[in-house]
Every structure is written in C-alpha cells, then in structure tokens.
Curated annotation (Swiss-Prot):
Gene that specifies this protein: cbbL
GO molecular function annotations of the record: magnesium ion binding; monooxygenase activity; ribulose-bisphosphate carboxylase activity
Lineage: Bacteria, Pseudomonadati, Pseudomonadota, Alphaproteobacteria, Rhodobacterales
Description of how the protein assembles with itself and partners: Heterohexadecamer of 8 large chains and 8 small chains.
Residues noted as binding Mg(2+) in the record, renumbered to the chain: 194, 196-197
Active site: 168 (proton acceptor), 287 (proton acceptor)
Cross-referenced InterPro entries: RuBisCO, RuBisCo_large_chain_AS, RuBisCO_lsu_C, RuBisCO_lsu_C_sf, RuBisCO_lsu_fd_N, RuBisCO_lsu_N_sf, RuBisCO_lsuI
Sites bearing N6-carboxylysine, chain numbering: 194
Catalytic activity, EC: 4.1.1.39
Cofactor list: Mg(2+)
Keywords per UniProt: Calvin cycle, Carbon dioxide fixation, Lyase, Magnesium, Metal-binding, Monooxygenase, Oxidoreductase, Photosynthesis
The family this protein is said to belong to: Belongs to the RuBisCO large chain family. Type I subfamily.
UniProt binding sites for substrate: 116, 166, 170, 288, 320, 372
Record's protein name: Ribulose bisphosphate carboxylase large chain
Amino acid sequence: MAAKTYDAGVKDYRSIYWEPQYQVKDSDILAVFKVVPQPGVSREEAAAAVAAESSTATWTTVWTDLLTDLDYYKGRAYAIEDVPGSDEAFYAFIAYPMDLFEEGSVVNVFTSLVGNVFGFKAVRALRLEDVRFPLWFVMTCPGAPHGMKVERDLLDKYGRPLLGCTIKPKLGLAAKNYGRAVYECLRGGLDFTKDDENVNSQPFLRWRDRFLFCQEAIQKAEAETGERKGHYMNVTAGTMEEIYERAEFAKEIGTPIIMSDYLTVGWAAHTSLSRWCRKNGMLLHVHRAMHAVMDRNPNHGINFRVLAKILRLMGGDHLHSGTVVGKLEGDREATIGWINLLRDRFIKADRSRGIFFDQDWGPQPGLFPVASGGIHVWHMPALVSIFGNDSVLQFGGGTLGHPWGNAAGACANRVALEACVQARNEGRHLEKEGKEILTKAAQSSPELRMAMETWKEIKFEFDTVDKLDVQHR
C-alpha cells in the first residue's frame, strides 16, 4: 500500500520558497530547523513549506498577493543537510528578510518562526535548532540591564565564580523562618540566596513579608561579614501591574537584585521588566522554569540555545543554563555552547557545541550563566572547570542539607570554591585532582569535611535526553 501523501492544505511551495542558489545577506535573520516530514513529502517541499508558513504564505493563492512584492518579503529555504544518526529528520536552513519583522520585538520574530508552522500538516515534527540574529536586530533589543562587569563592580567581587543558594523547602516556609534561612546562608559565606521559581505570593508567604524579612537578613549578614550580599526576590506575578509593584517595593527597601521567570511570565512582560531594571539600577536574575517543555524533546520544540539567545536579547543579568553534573538535563558540550552564547561578544559557528551560525552581539554586555540543580561540594572542581570565573554556582540542597545547618553548608561551599580557584590558578587540573584538592582543604575546615562525608555517595546516573547530534562529537 502506498504511503499517504498529505495533499490537503499543502500547495507546491517548492517552486517558490526553495532557493538553493540564494546568497544569504548580513541583514537576514537565519534559522535552522530539524524537520521530520510526513510520509510522501519530499525534503525540499517540507523545507519550503516551513519557510512559507513561517513567513508570507497561506494555503492557497489569494488575489492580494498581487498588491505586494512577495518575492521580497518571503522566507527562503536555501540549504538542506542530513541529521547524523537519523533516517527521517533533516536540517532545513531558512533566511528571512529584515523587513519581515518589527525592530526590537522578540515576540514578533517568534510569532512567525514558531507560530502556526509547528502545527502544519506537511511536517510530522519540527524543532528550531538555532537562529542567527543580525546586528541590526540585536542593536534594537534592550539586552542585559547591566551585565557581568557592572555587577562585579557593584559587589566588589572579582576573580572567582559567585556563590548562591536556593532556599528550601521551596514552598511552605513562613516569612520569618524564610528570612532566617537566608541570613544563615549569607553569613556562612554565600554571595546570594534565591527565591525558587514558584515562590510568588502564596497564603503562607506573602511577597511583602518575604521581601522585608529577606532584606533584614541581607543587611545583618553584610554588617557581620563586611561583604555585599543579596537575595533574588522573585517579582513574578499574574499581571504586569503586580510585577511593577513588587519591583518598586524591592527597590524602595534597598535590595540590589530581583528575579523573573521569563518563560512563564511572558516575553513581553519580561522585556518590560528588564527595561525597568536598567532604568532603576536593579540587577535581574532570570529563571528558565518551563524550558524543558519546549527544549527537551530532541525532535520537536525549540532548542535551549535559541531560548538563551532570546533571553540575551530581552535582557537579564543571570540565566540558569544547566550544570552538566547535577540532577537536571544538560549535555556537556551543548551546555558549554550555551555558556559561550550568554557571555561572549562574538561566537563562531561550532557544530561540536551545537552552534550553527556565527553570532555577533555587538556592544551588548554578557550575562552570568547559572549552574543550579542537584549540585554539592563534590561537584565544585568540575563546576569551576566548566563554568570558569564568570558564573554563578548555586547550591540549594547542597547548602541547606548540611547536617550542621545552613551556615555550615554555606561555609563548606565557600571553602571548596576558594580551594578550587586557588588550585586552578596554580595550574592544577581540577577534574582530575578534585578529590585531592577538596580533601586537603577539608583538613582545616570541619564544615567541608562533614559536607564531603554527607554527599560522597550522591550521584545522578540518568543520561541526558537531548544530546548533540552524533556526527559533531
């Protein structure tokens, strides 16, 4: 029996939108999709259909086509490549002209690129793997409110990763107990503590009470340690008016940094908050809650490298980027690629890290990648090696789970971090010599010694689901 061809709703896009001879322009927005076509649909037709449905086309010819220059405005599928290890999927490279999009609007770009086309019958699965944003578009977007250099100057902390902790349990603590947990962590040696992504303003922990107790903890810890401290106060809320109210209150009481869940709050709302942070001198920590809904399926959705680029355009000073070694999803080479996309000014295409296009960020400042999720002191050598200085290493259970309490857990992490940074600066190989480095440091730190004993058997053995395609290893 012949394979079914999906004719309904599909016109001959190949003759119009497939242009293998097209020479891409510096001003084009470029995208690469992983496409699994329906049976009976050729690669060229499927690629052209994606280009058409994500730009100018509808399912049939309409008379108003004659009132514009469709050849100027259309997206063009200009190349096709095999996906290593797959007999069904292929990469489709598509170029979009600059006038197809509103300047500075990530929302507008992705309404086209990942809009109706993802439900199109000609394709069985579709994944946006990478996007090249030309400099003209980058320069019209807000970017990071402040960036890494400004934050280091504000904190007066240089030469090492910043150290943080997510307060646990993530839900259920009353405001006074929550503030006490923050204080213990900060006085123990952490730079920051953090609200978890789903801490907003629940009945047991109203946002105003949380902010006040956390700010009291910050001020007390700063007075005792002589260091600048902070707590990422999550201002995410159900309306933009509530978000601004919470942000204004955080500014009023003197906190240096607030937090947003950029995917669940919405891209327009997050961009507005980012602009507010720049105007008001507030740092912005960004959580990626909901990302795995879009990026974990290797055949359908949006790769996290695209979501990371979106955030860099919209604005944030920190973004969670995976850990490689913790409990959450994160292929090593792919994660290093994401880290580079967040921090560096210019990134060369590098298929070994999953990066399909050169990306020039111009003068936009880089932001701190955040490692968080199931990490503890035994992971410190690998984290310092993978992430380098310009990063935030965030230990939740790996701080608060210390048998001697939060302050001891924070102290253990700080001692481990400084030992690893010193060893690295001496030229030692952290991932090969990590155990020896930590063991020596623990000789003068009972807190670290107890942390190492507590978590020596803890491992997360599950493999990564979303891996880089095998050919590029």
